[in-house]
Amino acid sequence: MKKILLTNDDGYHAKGIKALEQALEEMAEIYVVAPKHEKSACSQCITITAPLRAEKIKGKEGRHYRIDDGTPSDCVYLAINELFKHVCFDLVISGINLGSNMGEDTIYSGTVAGAIEGTIQGVPSIAISQILSNKNKNTPLSFDLAQKIIQDLVQNIFTKGYPLKGRKLLNVNVPNCSLQEYQGERITPKGYRLYKKEVHKRTDPKNESYFWLGLHPLEWQKRENEDRLSDFDAIASNHVSITPLNLDLTSYDDLKSLESWHEGMLK
């Protein structure tokens, strides 16, 4: 039977990872290693300055752990190299994240980082996120569409094989809409996220300042002369966005121009 490792950045008890497990439990043998506490926007952080403690969850056949103060990258690293080192995983899936991970957010994202760590460890990996809107943050959220998408995607991978070669992963974003409103899937490039420079300054009872970094509205810049919808555009039209991501961040188009610019200094 196929074996899938799940993680997230919302924490072991988050609704998204439970929905993910429910969606896949009849398709594969599921293992879960997730942070004990929320680690949103922790990026590819891995813990090397403090010990990590792994708590085995009772009643889960020894396949569930939560990592005290661990990040998604910690969780995947520990799962593959120690906790389940005798298990050959077919997939690592990180999610279902509560909120989008598109454009430059993929660099900040702990969810995407979990899938990146799986890729680094040589396992085909997927990050999946459920878009939220301001109006529904405090209302019940349905994962029906996200569950359907991940089931279809995993089944396709099990049938056809993983579609990417080398150090690459899939980043999936699911729109905040019903199955009836859903318009299909699009293979997309990353868009350009627009950020506001918000910092919220507050004063505590001791009259000392503290700060909250601003939560930015989901705004983006339209790509010019682009035949494909970006991930943002796809979501805005109730499409699921599937984006291939490459761990190699080298800007190959600029290598020659940089050599020319640096001419005379290179030895």
Swiss-Prot record:
Co-factor binding comment: Binds 1 divalent metal cation per subunit.
Gene Ontology MF terms in the entry: 3'-nucleotidase activity; 5'-nucleotidase activity; exopolyphosphatase activity; metal ion binding; nucleotide binding
This protein's GO CC annotations: cytoplasm
Keyword Transport attributed: no
Reaction(s) the record says it catalyses: a ribonucleoside 5'-phosphate + H2O = a ribonucleoside + phosphate
Entry keyword Hydrolase: yes
Keywords: Cytoplasm, Hydrolase, Metal-binding, Nucleotide-binding
Subcellular location field: Cytoplasm
Major subcellular location class: cytoplasm
Residue ranges the record marks as coiled coil: none
Cofactor: a divalent metal cation
InterPro entries: SurE, SurE-like_Pase/nucleotidase, SurE-like_sf
EC number: 3.1.3.5
Family: Belongs to the SurE nucleotidase family.
Protein task: Nucleotidase that shows phosphatase activity on nucleoside 5'-monophosphates.
Protein name, UniProt field: 5'-nucleotidase SurE
Origin species: Helicobacter pylori (strain HPAG1)
Gene this protein is translated from: surE
